[in-house]
Curated annotation (Swiss-Prot):
Keywords: Ribonucleoprotein, Ribosomal protein, RNA-binding, rRNA-binding, tRNA-binding. This is Small ribosomal subunit protein uS7. CDD domains: uS7_Bacteria (cd14869). One of its GO terms (cellular component) is small ribosomal subunit. Belongs to the universal ribosomal protein uS7 family. The gene is rpsG. GO terms for biological process: translation. One of the primary rRNA binding proteins, it binds directly to 16S rRNA where it nucleates assembly of the head domain of the 30S subunit. Is located at the subunit interface close to the decoding center, probably blocks exit of the E-site tRNA.
Length: 156
């Protein structure tokens, strides 16, 4: 136990355009080498293109796509005796958002398109329609947790 006070998690500043903390976190995860303005331009142009295609507000589209990718359960390794079990555990809300954002960005980076904004637009559109690599990743994680349901009593 630390003798000094426990330092809480730093509050993230909301993004300038939509004043959303979720979107600011997404921009921070997308950012490479501290180039935040480039990451902001990519995200904002992707959301603008998406709003033209879907004809809804940008932030509503983003949140809906994120909700379709969020995992409910995941597996964690737990060593019992001499063997390691994959124990299914429920995902905390903060980690849910972080995993969903990371999976969307990774899937967008693996796509083959001209620019990152187009790749991100297509991946968010796929996530909105419950298809695409990010949604496949969530289904894979859920399937893994379902297969290891027998070890749920090892939860800690």
């Amino acid at each position: 136990m630390p003798r000094r006070r426990i330092i809480g998690q730093r509050k993230i500043l909301p993004d300038p355009k939509f004043s959303s903390e979720l979107l600011a976190k997404f921009i921070n995860i997308l950012m490479i080498n501290g180039k935040k303005s480039i990451a902001e331009n990519i995200v904002y142009s992707a959301l603008h293109q998406l709003s033209i295609k879907v004809k809804k507000k940008e932030l509503d589209i983003f949140i809906a796509a994120l909700d379709n990718v969020k995992p409910v359960v995941e597996v964690k390794s737990r060593r019992v005796g001499g063997s390691t079990y994959q124990v299914p555990v429920e995902v905390r809300p903060v980690r849910r958002n972080a995993l969903a954002m990371r999976w969307i960005i990774d899937a967008a980076r693996k796509r083959i398109d001209r620019s990152m904004s187009i790749r991100l637009t297509n991946e968010l559109l796929d996530a909105l329609e419950n298809k695409g690599a990010a949604v496949r990743k969530r289904e894979e994680v859920h399937k893994m947790a379902d297969a290891n349901k027998a070890f749920a009593h090892y939860r800690w």
